[in-house]
From Swiss-Prot:
Predominant cellular place of this UniProt entry's protein: secreted
Originating species: Schizosaccharomyces pombe (strain 972 / ATCC 24843) (Fission yeast)
EC number(s) stated in the UniProt entry for this protein: 3.2.1.58
Enzyme class (EC, first level): hydrolase
Entry protein name: Glucan 1,3-beta-glucosidase 2
PANTHER family named among the record's database cross-references: GLUCAN 1,3-BETA-GLUCOSIDASE 2, GLUCAN ENDO-1,6-BETA-GLUCOSIDASE B
Annotated keywords: Cell wall biogenesis/degradation, Glycoprotein, Glycosidase, Hydrolase, Secreted, Signal
The keyword Glycoprotein belongs to this UniProt entry's keyword annotation: yes
Highest rank taxon of the organism: Eukaryota
Compartments in which it is found: Secreted
Active-site positions on this chain: E338, E439
Amino acid sequence: MSNLLEAESSCDSKSLGVDDFTSKRCREIDKKALLITILLTFFVSLCVFLSIILPLIFLVIIPHAQSDRKIKDTNMETTNLGVNIIDEIFNSTQVPEWAKNSLLDTNTWLDTSDFNTSFTNETFAGLYTMGIFDKYDDSVQANPNVPPLNEPFPYGRLPIRGVNLGGWLSMEPFITPSFFQVKNETAYLVKDELSLHAYLGENATSVIENHYNTFVTKQTFYEIREAGLDHVRITFPYWILYSNEITNVSGIGWRYLLRSIEWAREQGLRVNLDLHAAPGNQNSWNHGGYLNQMEWLDGTVKGEENSQFTLKIHERLASFFSQKRYRNVVTIYGALNEPNFFVLDEHKITDWHKQAYAVIRQSNFTGLISLSDGFRGPGNWEDHFDPFHFPNILIDVHRYIIFNDFLIGLRPKDKLNVICKSWNEEMKLKAKLPTIIGEWSLADTDCAKFLNNVGEGARWDGTFTPNGGVASCSEKVGCRCDFANQDPENYEDSYRKFLYALATSQIETFDKTWGWFYWNWDTENATQWSYKKSWLAGLLPRLAYSTTKDFNCSMLDSKSFMEFDEQSEF
């Protein structure tokens, strides 16, 4: 700067008669000065321009454009999924290139209703939070009989009255038989969900996600609340949690599980999460993964690896649902559905349950933890899980009268006596720990299609292969399945009366425990396995918490119910 000032000073002397060299130098400096002046003038003008234009852009033009866009969005036709086209375009620009066509890309989602479609790759405990809205409301009350979600449920004083959402995230052949009717000339080709995925091949993703999106909807939770229920037990297989190699549709169900919990919250319904299928299959049954496969705690290296993998899953899952937003709604956590005590070492299963309990607690889940009785009954669990060392534990008992040749063959009134007397006494005398009935149904036969596996018949009418053609109905001859499988509108009055008594006797007995969950909320066509269908047909009480006086266990010996002893098979 000083050199420039000196040059300018010397040039001022030009008029005082400086030499030609100095004159030439001064002309060069004059050019530089002119250029600097021009640049400074431009810069000042630009600043003035921006000071005027920028406020106009941010205060007038952009808000006006946003207003126009909102109006266009309001009037624009939506796609058949209910998503505005502009929103789709906007969302697609949010998804980074590396996430395109991944589980995080909302443009690949079949449905975006009630999902937060703002892109995020955030995780908690290794599980994606994609699709969840930040805000939630825990002030909702399912019915006047129970407290709102933000107040503690009085477990042990007020029975749970709930229903299962089975056959949804964890598919089962008898619940949705239409998926499993694939066969050739000699045999059925699809026996379980994983073989269904394999059969569908490249179509598996679209077919299975469509099932996720339609079999359980927002309306489902509204109807459950309308039926007077207050809990839902959501069953799921491990492969929905995150991508893995066991199936090409893995990971998709996770966001549907999270959305369903929010739908339950909106209706004031508390959730019992239940792992229904563990790595390797914990029981070899069709709802555990691959039918007739059991590589879980079976004494093999692979079985041990899978049992430890299951604990790792609980570490992630329990940590995720220990978050504050879930404490009022996910109040029960199931360790594992129906591990096979008939085949596996019961001591190993018991030890594994202790490990699972420890992992879940160390992951900061503070709610109730349920352990399956594995069909062993409610007794003797206190020898292994004393309340001091294992607080807030539930024994999950499943009760059916149709999978046992003796029980299924009893006459109608005798079945009611088993429920009202035998089961009632068993719960009273043997259930030393808090006990729930995690599954029960209205079915008095095993006639539902594919109930005993795809392509297998029924004990009731003698078509169940292991029974060698021997029917199990009380008459042993002339046993038919058509009466149980027909439309309930065609049921005879005596059969309707019996089924209602079968329902209310179980409710009365199970209300004396910590509560119950009916299996299942809905099916494609098996009425007696569907709470919804049976409820609409008048075979269940109008409100689960308010049973009528039409039947109770004390009425079994009254003359009006002696007819159950006299009637033949329906």
